[in-house]
Amino acid sequence: MPTEPTAAPPRPPLDWPTLGRIVLKALLLFTLLNAAFAAARPLEALGRLSLYNGLLPGRARLPYGEVPANDYNLTLNNLPAMFAAHELARPKAADEFRVLLIGDSGTWGWFLRHEATLAGQLNDLGLRAADGRRVVVYNLGYPVLSLTKDLLLLDTALSDDADLILWPVTLHSLARGRQFDHPLLQQNADHVRDLIARYNLALDPFDSRLVVRTRLDETLVARRRDLADLLRLQALALAWAATGIDQAIPADIPLRQSDLDADESWLDIAGPRPLTDDDLTFDVLRAGVARAGGVPVVVINEPIFISDGANSNVRYNSFYPRWAYDQYRERLARAAAAEGWRYVDLWDAIPPDEFTDTPVHLTPAGARLLAEKLVEVLEPDIIQIRN
């Protein structure tokens, strides 16, 4: 008669000491993992690992997106990840004349498809350098009005072989008190402080907006959002490759203000007075040209919307009262002459109808016209580019 298999003895109930040891080991492992993460600070190294420019094409402009699900893009503050995702990271071709285009949201191309931006329009012109190389323009604009942001991006980008730098600027970009307003600068505080020290900039390295991280701020728990952003950027690479979309553009774009208030203030300056170096960051502009070294830099006073509506005798647009902008133009021209900069003033080069929602954002036709005008003034005296 077959015998029934002996039943396994019942497991003893989980007693409190055993449970305590399990929890203690888990806490110890969790603590060690966070301590190792804080000590290694791996986010920048992880940012350099990218699907872009390898398995999938690089982006035509730096990552920036307010609604990732619609933009197939997102905003993050990891500079290595931003540049690893950009097409600038691909190897430079032997016949390539590499042009870096830096600047604000107008350069980045707000409400423009990437091929309709200034960089895209310049590339569409099929330009050649004097030595016959193909002119390839890389869009390194970023939607922040800050010359310090431009310097930060330029300092990062110049590890790649550049032949020319185009640098559109506007008065708001020089406002000293607003240089650190964006998280890109705040979260890259060590890099910003290094630039301040390296170029003796009249900016406060201890500004409260610049983040100071303790060891606890560098743990995996504290930086989990930044780590998730790296993963999200890689996840969006397939959508970018499949669609070429990196910004959701509404069907109806709101137009800039034409009828203006009778208000002579500029930012926190209540009314007309001389603008000084305490107001304007010409030192940061000098630092950018110095950082370029032997790479030629063309400083461009970018076009602005000029209103003919109510109170247009007081203000050019919603950004700028006439007194402040006129002083800025005069001071920029004087600084360029004194420093020997290559300088182009295109402030009134674009008709008012070719601006969209702000005084510095262009339509596709406006960006095309700007590209053509820029080529006209650069050829042949400055860089000798030709079709």
Residue locations for each model-derived region?
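Hydrophobic membrane-insertion alpha-helices, especially the h-region
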Residues: 21-39
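Loop/turn elements at helix/coil->beta-strand transitions in domains of secreted/extracellular proteins
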Residues: 97, 133-135, 160-165, 293-297, ...
